[in-house]
Each structure stands twice: as structure tokens, then as C-alpha cells.
A protein has these predicted regions:
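Transmembrane signal-anchor helices characteristic of membrane glycosylation enzymes that use polyprenol
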Residues: 2-6, 11-57, 219-233, 309
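Perimembrane helix-loop-helix junctions
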Residues: 13, 173, 195-219
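Aromatic/glycine/proline-enriched transmembrane-helix motif characteristic
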Residues: 17-24, 28, 116, 125, ...
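Extracytoplasmic catalytic/substrate-binding loops of multi-pass membrane glycan-assembly enzymes
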Residues: 49-62, 77-89
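Loop-to-helix entry region of an early transmembrane alpha helix in multi-pass inner-membrane enzymes
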Residues: 80, 84, 98-117, 150, ...
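Specific aromatic-rich, kink-prone transmembrane helix
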Residues: 118-121, 159-178, 329-333
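Short acidic/glycine- and proline-prone juxtamembrane loop motifs at membrane-interface regions
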Residues: 151-157, 319
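Membrane-interface alpha helices of multi-pass inner-membrane proteins
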Residues: 164-170, 177-193, 197-200, 307-314
């Protein structure tokens, strides 16, 4: 009964957000929204706790560890591999007598609602039409990967990707201080977000570039870490941390993640993958820095979506859950450009297959290589769209 009430409250929150945006004014829209919300949260209720994997077990063990360590006082220890903001929530949930994992799953579902709202905000920056904005919100809530990574595996990747999506919507609106704050929170929740931050330069080419916003990024990050410092956490452990390349090449990587690393058992190609992503991101930002190209907000969102897909494909720190955030950005883009539907389908297939392999293992007969090929196909579609739209702009001029 508790799960039903909480999920019903989150569904009500989703409806209130749509109502506040003025997207449910007609009876037809209300009927469609209620049906989609019933399907989205009904599936979450049915699949809640089904086939927990190693990620869910790790979260449950971490919450139990905090319960034994005295709640928030356990933050001073570096025994757990989770980021500090995530440990804040684990320490908070450990104060409950039981059901800490269930509370963490509710947090994941709340972040998915936030991502749906951020997706419709990105669409709103291009068009005020209600239909594409409504589609963006509802499709994000109905994505299979979002349901799997939230209520099944309790993966926290939706937490930091929610801030990336919010940062994108703020950047498209020119709200640089809020954008910097959202990026800081994303980096605090997962250091992998630091690789996405430079790509946001594609939003600044035709607007006043406020370097002062970087101070906001640092300030927000420090503010998030202050409670951990006050509780006795060493300052060196509050910085974004990555394993060394030597450590990466000495152990297997996430074999359940789509990308180049699913094609090799060991991470001997880790330096190559990192170099490919860095070069690609620099070329993308350099190309989009031209005012004639960067004035198109659709292309800005395309560039960010493409960079997010490349991050999952080439960076060795990404896992099967990381593709969900890029998938959400693609949904927002597809609602603006329906011709990009094949890219969304490929990315959704890759994300769902990777998550199913992560949850059910060998019970899923398709190899993870199919997810890697689908991810590559989505990247190719986005590249072709960038080239095609460039030619269209030239012909129109």
C-alpha cells in the first residue's frame, strides 16, 4: 500500500507540473496525460523490486552500513565508493528502521520526473506549442530504460543526468548562473559529468559569455561538500576522482555497458577511448562556435545529445545506466525533429538491452554487442542530421 501511495503522489506531481506549464487545458490532453501517467507509474508499481541486481544489493548494503555507523556520522569515512551527495541520501535513509532501498528507489523515480520536466523545458526553448512539449514529458516517463534503472536496479545515474538535463534547459534560456549551478550538482553526484561540462560551450557562441558563471559552478560544488567537511571528511576526498589509467588497464571494465569496451574484455583501449572522446568534443565545440551554426537551438541540443552518446561509447567510467540521460536529451530533440526518431529508437534499444543484461545477465540471449551497434547507429544519425541541417541553412541563405 505504501508503494502505491508514494507512486500515486509522484504521478500527481507529474500532473501538477504539466498543469502549471499549461499543457492540460483541453479534455483530450487531460485524457492522454492521465492514460500515460497510469501506464508509466503502473509499470513502476508492478516492476518495483523485481530481480534486483548487484547495484541494488550494493545500495542496500551501503544503507545498512550507514545505519550501523550512526547515520550521518558515517560520512566521515571513505569506506564506500559512492559520491558524497549520494551518501547524504543514504545516511538520511538509514535513519528509517527498514526499507532504505525502497526510499532510494523513490528518489530515483523523482529524478525521472525531474528529467521529464527538464526535457519539456528544452523543447519549450524552441517552440511554445503544447503538443511536442507534452510528448517530451510523457515519453521520458515511459522510457523502458528509465523504469528498469529506477525501480528494478536502483541505479543512481538518473540523479546526475537530471541536473545535466536541467543545465541544458537553463543554457538554452541563457540562464548561465543556474546552468553553472546545475552542472556543479551533476559533477558532485558523479565525476563523469565533468566530461560533459565543456560541451556546454556550444550554447555560449552567440550569447554573452559570462566567465563569472564558472565561479558559480565552483561555489555550488563547494557548498555541496561543506556538510561532509564539517562532519570530518578529508578535503582531498571531496574532489572529483577518477581511477588512474594504470588501474583501468589492469582490470575488466563494465562489460554490460554499450560502447567500444564491450568489444574487448580488458581496458587496454581505455587511453584510446578517452583520446577519441576528447578530440571529438573539441571538434564539436569548435565547429559549433561559429555564429552561423550556433544560432540554431536545435543544433545546440543535437550537439549535446551527440556528445552524451559519445561519452557513453568512449569513456571507460560509464556504465549501462549512463545511456539513459543521453536518451532523454534525444527524446527532447526528436519531439522537435521527428525525422530523428531512428536515433531515439536505436538509443532506447541499446539502453534497454544493456540494463536487461545488467539485471538478468545471461537470461537475455542477445549479446551486448548489439547494443553497441545500436549506439553507433544513433550517433551516425545525429551526425547526418548536423550535416543535413548545415546544407539546408546554406541553401536558404
Amino acid at each position: 500500500m505504501e508503494r502505491f501511495v508514494i507512486l500515486l503522489a509522484l504521478a500527481g506531481l507529474s500532473y501538477l507540473l504539466l498543469h502549471a506549464e499549461g499543457l492540460v487545458k483541453t479534455s483530450r490532453a487531460r485524457f492522454a496525460v492521465l492514460g500515460a501517467l497510469f501506464a508509466a507509474f503502473g509499470l513502476r508499481l508492478i516492476l518495483f523490486g523485481v530481480a534486483p541486481n548487484d547495484t541494488a544489493n550494493a545500495v542496500e548494503s551501503a544503507i545498512a552500513w550507514y545505519r550501523d555507523a550512526g547515520g550521518f556520522w558515517g560520512i566521515r569515512s571513505s569506506a564506500l565508493p559512492f559520491s558524497i551527495p549520494v551518501q547524504y541520501f543514504m545516511a538520511l535513509f538509514s535513519l528509517a528502521p527498514d526499507g532504505g532501498l525502497t526510499l532510494f528507489k523513490y528518489l530515483c523515480v523523482f529524478s525521472e520526473v525531474t528529467m521529464a520536466w527538464a526535457a519539456q523545458r528544452c523543447v519549450q526553448c524552441v517552440t511554445v506549442r503544447a503538443q511536442p512539449r507534452l510528448f517530451a514529458f510523457l515519453i521520458v516517463l515511459l522510457l523502458p530504460s528509465g523504469i528498469f534503472q529506477g525501480v528494478c536496479s536502483a541505479a543512481g545515474d538518473s540523479l546526475w543526468w537530471a541536473f545535466i538535463a536541467l543545465a541544458a534547459s537553463c543554457a538554452m534560456r541563457g540562464e548561465w548562473r543556474w546552468c553553472a549551478g546545475m552542472l556543479a550538482l551533476a559533477v558532485a553526484f558523479h565525476p563523469a559529468a565533468l566530461w560533459i561540462v565543456p560541451v556546454f560551450w556550444v550554447f555560449t557562441a552567440v550569447r554573452r559569455n559570462t566567465w563569472f558563471s564558472l565561479l558559480h559552478l565552483v561555489g555550488w560544488y563547494v557548498a555541496v561538500m561543506v556538510p561532509a567537511l564539517l562532519l570530518g571528511r578529508p578535503g582531498s576526498e571531496c574532489l572529483p576522482f577518477y581511477p588512474s589509467l594504470a588501474a583501468l588497464t589492469a582490470r575488466p571494465l563494465f562489460d554490460g555497458a554499450p560502447g567500444i569496451y564491450s568489444l574487448s574484455q580488458y581496458s587496454i583501449i581505455a587511453p584510446t577511448g578517452i583520446a577519441i572522446y576528447v578530440v571529438f568534443a573539441l571538434l564539436l565545440v569548435w565547429r559549433m562556435s561559429r555564429k552561423s551554426l550556433a544560432a540554431d537551438r536545435r543544433r545546440q541540443l543535437t550537439a549535446l545529445s551527440l556528445a552524451s552518446l559519445c561519452a557513453v561509447a568512449f569513456l571507460p567510467w560509464m556504465c549501462a545506466d549512463s545511456l539513459y540521460g543521453a536518451e532523454v536529451l534525444l527524446v527532447a530533440l526528436c519531439c522537435l525533429e521527428p525525422k530523428l526518431t531512428p536515433a531515439v529508437v536505436c538509443a532506447s534499444f541499446a539502453s534497454a538491452l544493456a540494463l536487461l543484461k545488467d539485471i538478468y545477465g545471461s537470461a537475455v540471449f542477445l549479446p551486448i554487442g548489439w547494443a553497441s551497434l545500436a549506439l553507433l547507429a544513433a550517433m551516425i544519425v545525429l551526425l547526418l542530421y548536423l550535416v543535413f541541417r548545415k546544407r539546408t541553412v546554406k541553401q536558404a541563405g
